[in-house]
Amino acid sequence: MESEKVVVDELPLAIVRRVVKKKLSECSPDYDVSIHKEALLAFSESARIFIHYLSATANDFCKDARRQTMKADDVFKALEEMDFSEFLEPLKSSLEDFKKKNAGKKAGAAAASYPAGGAALKSSSGTASKPKETKKRKQEEPSTQKGARKSKIDEETKRNDEETENDNTEEENGNDEEDENGNDEEDENDDENTEENGNDEENDDENTEENGNDEENEKEDEENSMEENGNESEESGNEDHSMEENGSGVGEDNENEDGSVSGSGEEVESDEEDE
């Protein structure tokens, strides 16, 4: 476990070698200084111990200020506390150069991403002036993921609620349409029944008129038959009267005949008497 911890805390040797050789080339520009492996390991371990001590001292100043994010001012105060004040000016100048380079890189990247985005360029330059807050970012990442997950769940819940409301609305509309259709069908049936009743009434009226016409025709037939009977009775009366007249004529004829007979008898009797 201790060996793994040393490996984890050990600084990258390539970076340590590059930093050391750059400084040595400034100190001895006439010749190239070679670095032994053990010397490189010693530089690496010394830098690690120095960084640990410097970070612990800077953390104390950060706690005194009641902040959770360490700033460059905390590191500067820690260097003064460790009696490295002579390194503050070159450290601050190198830090300003780093800020300018970093701001230029971010501005170029923002301009490439947003060609006409002046506001995006301004915001990127404003964020570049701030130091990196790696610790705070790591703490905020889980909360951001939780917030994103929660917002996603809320969106899904809202979508499901909207779908449920739409389904209920469609069902209600379908029921309303069915009720309207059923009412329309009932109204149509009522209209048809009303029309049929009207037709039945018209047929009844027509039948009534026909019955009235039949009754009138029957009355006319009765009157005609009565008139015919009256005419027949008159004719029979005329016949009886003619028969009576004929009878009276016959009687007169008979009487005349009887008179002639009696006359002839008298004539016969007178003739006999004359004889």
UniProtKB/Swiss-Prot annotation:
Residues 112-122 have a biased composition (Low complexity). GO terms for cellular component: nucleus. CDD domains: HFD_POLE3_DPB4. GO terms for biological process: regulation of DNA-templated transcription; response to heat; response to water deprivation. Induction: Repressed by heat and dehydration stress. Keywords: Activator, Coiled coil, DNA-binding, Nucleus, Transcription, Transcription regulation. Its main location: nucleus. It comes from the Eukaryota. GO terms for molecular function: DNA binding; DNA-binding transcription factor activity; protein heterodimerization activity. Residues 152-179 form a coiled coil. It is found in: Nucleus. Residues 11-17 bind DNA. Residues 151-161 have a biased composition (Basic and acidic residues). A motif (Nuclear localization signal) lies at residues 135-142. Residues 112-275 are annotated as: Disordered. Residues 162-237, 266-275 have a biased composition (Acidic residues). Belongs to the NFYB/HAP3 subunit family. Heterotrimeric transcription factor composed of three components, NF-YA, NF-YB and NF-YC. NF-YB and NF-YC must interact and dimerize for NF-YA association and DNA binding. Binds directly with DPB3-1. PANTHER family: DNA POLYMERASE EPSILON SUBUNIT 3. Component of the NF-Y/HAP transcription factor complex. The NF-Y complex stimulates the transcription of various genes by recognizing and binding to a CCAAT motif in promoters. This is DNA polymerase II subunit B4. It comes from Arabidopsis thaliana (Mouse-ear cress).
